Structure formats: structure tokens, C-alpha cells
Amino acid sequence: MSEIIHRSKTRPVRVGNITIGGNNEVVIQSMTTTKTHDVDATVAQIHRLEEAGCQIVRVACPDERAADAIAEIKKRINIPLVVDIHFDYRLALKAIENGADKIRINPGNIGKREKVEAVVKAAKERGVPIRIGVNAGSLEKRILDKYGYPTADGMVESALHHIRILEDLDFQDIIVSLKASDVRLAIEAYEKAARAFDYPLHLGITESGTLFAGTVKSAAGLGAILSKGIGNTVRVSLSADPVEEVKVARELLKAFGLAANAATLISCPTCGRIEIDLISIANEIEEYIAQIKAPIKVAVLGCAVNGPGEAREADIGIAGARGEGLLFRHGKIVRKVPEETMVEELKKEIDKLAEEYASKGKQK
């Protein structure tokens, strides 16, 4: 399968210790659901997100209590912190002063140009990038008056208008998002944006829904955009524990070969030929490999029909039979294992393979 081609002219923008854009990998983001002023709860959730693979985290900043909490939160986390600003530009100024690694502003509600200018000046002084967050649900009145309703052209026009304001102030540390809850609108907007400017694009389908429906909707929209080589960072928006957002984002990137050092599971859908408890085995292995930092493909297969063929495509795998399983490695049978020890034996082989990849990496 051919590799996805990324836009080579995307500008790199530094966010804390991570660079978005350029030739860098697509970065996974999420957003906390805690009250930001509750520092302990917010930090605890961010630590869970970090553990799940979140690389950049965003917090809401609806009031001064939240802005005042930024400094303490920053001290206690290890990943870059983005502060989300709506309506009151003064909160952006305070967040920047307190150590935010990036600011997200919505052009539709931040206010007059001079307020944006004040935020840009503060960000420039501290080397803090700004994400221009265009949202189909909150476009400026002049855009809606011109187009009649949210359109991809209107969203891109809004983004370009605010990009020019920042550029006029000699500010180029810009990241742009063009989010919509309508999947087709979002796809069109991101496609047009990718042709209109070379700033990094933050991908997202906003208000996508619950864990199940939102995952499907996000995968459809974000997958279509990523498949075109568009996008430098991604946030899957779900009405769920934000850790689930990170899990979905990781799987989505893995599906397109965009997640380095991540293990992938393939498992069969099961049928009447299955003689082992494949579903529980697959779930356990999926959870186990979530923390494996090696590009390993693991197969959990239920019978001899597709098992051997699929196993050849995997680095390591198991093909089940009645009461036992065949352990495969790089398409070759390693040994038979009884069903009761099948999972533990597979885990051992996964660990061995991960160690081999790690040692190869150290030797380079």
C-alpha cells in the first residue's frame, strides 16, 4: 500500500517541546472535562491522558479562576498546555502570562481587532503560538450575511481574515482549525484550507456525539481528511471520558500508518467455526498492546480458515483451535499452546518482539 503523502510545505510551529507541522508526525490532542480552577482534578485527568498517549492537552478558560490556575497546572504536567479562550481577550493575556504553551481563540467571538492585537502582542513577546479556531457554529456575522449559512468557503474566508491580522502584526506562529459537526462540510473546509495557506492544520469534527456515534462520525470525517495527506494534529471530540478520545485518535492514526512505535491488533470477526473465546482474548490483547511502543502487528485469529494467511501479515499472532492455539511469528508456526495459557504466551512473545525493536533502535 502506498504511503500517505503529507504537504511538504506545511510550516513547523513549536508548541512547548513539540513541533506541529513540517515533516513531523500527526500529534494527538485532547481536552479536559474538569473545572480548570480545580487544579488537583485537572492535573489528575491530564496525567491519565498522558498515559493514554495524549501529546498536547487543552483546558477551558471561562473565567479568572481558570486563568489563575494555569501556572500551577503547568508545574505538575509533562505535556504542552493549550488554553481555550472565548469572548474575553483578557483571559488570554493572563493565560499567556501564567505559562500557556499555546492559545486557542475563536475569531467569531473574541471581539474587535484591537483585542486580537493585544493577544498577539503578548503571545509574540513570550513565543506562544496561536490557534485560530474557526467553527461553523459561530462564524462572524459578516460571513453569515455574505454566504447565508455556514459554508466551507465562508470558514476559509474567516480563517484567512484572521491569519492576515496576525501576519500584519508580524506573527506567523499560527495553527488553524476549521471545525464543523457536519462531516462533509468539515472535509470540504479542510481541503480548501490546505490549498489556501500552508499553516499547520488542527483536525477535528466538533460535537460529533457519544462514544459510539462520535467515534464513527470522527473516523469517517477525519479519516477522509487524513487520507488526502491533510492535517498535522488531531483531536477526536467525544461526549465521553477524554481518555477515549485519545484511544480513538491513536487507532485512527495507526489505521493510516501515521503512528510510529505503536502496536496494532488485527482480529477476526468470529463465526460459528470459533472454538475459543476469541472476543475476550482480543480485548485483553488490545488493552495489553496499548502501551507497547514498537511498530508490531499482532493477530488474534479464531480458526484455520483465515488464520495462517492473516498470521503471515502479522509480526506475532495466535490462531485458535479447540482447546489450543498455534503461535505464529512472522508467518511461521513457533509452537502449539493450550488455550488456558494462550494469552500469557502471546504476551511473552509480544514483549520479546518489543524488546528486539527497542534494541535495534538503540543500535542505530
UniProtKB/Swiss-Prot annotation:
Chain's role: Converts 2C-methyl-D-erythritol 2,4-cyclodiphosphate (ME-2,4cPP) into 1-hydroxy-2-methyl-2-(E)-butenyl 4-diphosphate.
Pathway in which the depicted protein is active: Isoprenoid biosynthesis; isopentenyl diphosphate biosynthesis via DXP pathway; isopentenyl diphosphate from 1-deoxy-D-xylulose 5-phosphate: step 5/6
GO function term, MF aspect, one: 4 iron, 4 sulfur cluster binding
Pfam family, any one: GcpE
Catalytic activity of the protein: (2E)-4-hydroxy-3-methylbut-2-enyl diphosphate + oxidized [flavodoxin] + H2O + 2 H(+) = 2-C-methyl-D-erythritol 2,4-cyclic diphosphate + reduced [flavodoxin]
Documented EC number(s): 1.17.7.3
Binding sites annotated in the UniProt record for [4Fe-4S] cluster: C268, C271, C303, E310
Cofactor: [4Fe-4S] cluster
Protein name, as recorded: 4-hydroxy-3-methylbut-2-en-1-yl diphosphate synthase (flavodoxin)
